[in-house]
Design a protein with these regions (language model features):
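Sec-dependent bacterial lipoprotein signal peptides
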Residues: 1-7
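Bacterial signal peptide processing site
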Residues: 8-12
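Asparagine-centered strand-capping/turn motif at beta-strand->loop junctions
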Residues: 14-24
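Short, ordered, surface-exposed loop/turn motifs in non-cytosolic proteins
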Residues: 23-34
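Short beta-strand segments within Ig-like beta-sandwich modules, predominantly Fibronectin type-III
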Residues: 37-43
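Exposed aromatic-hydrophobic patches
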Residues: 46-51
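A short, solvent-exposed beta-strand micro-motif common in secreted/extracellular proteins
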Residues: 55-66
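Extracellular beta-sheet/turn segments enriched in Thr/Pro/Gly and aliphatic residues
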Residues: 70-98
Length: 98
């Protein structure tokens, strides 16, 4: 019982991932719940894993090496639900895939 109670307090971990196989993106920032959190680069991907403490929607703002920007739209999120968001960046847009 105690393990369940402690596990319930931590919240589900959600993954936000941008595939950047061509190295076009210089940075990516998750905007969600009134805050901004940068994604970390790992080879050809930018990733972030965190719990979500709000209901609503958000976006990941991509800043490209050439100074341009794009927005990856995050759909509706809810606290304590495991949700993973995967996108692929190209020169003109951000594509969501599962």
């Amino acid at each position: 019982m105690t393990v369940f109670a402690l596990g319930g307090c931590t919240g589900a971990k959600n993954t936000f991932e941008i595939e950047d196989p061509r190295g076009l993106v210089s940075s990516a920032t998750l905007r969600l719940c009134g805050s901004e959190t940068p994604l970390a680069r790992e080879a050809d991907r930018l990733t972030l894993t965190r719990s979500i403490a709000c209901e609503g929607d958000g976006e990941i703002r991509l800043v490209y090496e050439d100074g341009g920007s794009r927005h990856c739209i995050i759909g509706y999120v809810t606290p304590d639900a495991k949700q993973d968001w995967h996108f692929r960046a190209d020169q003109s847009s951000c594509h969501h895939f599962t």
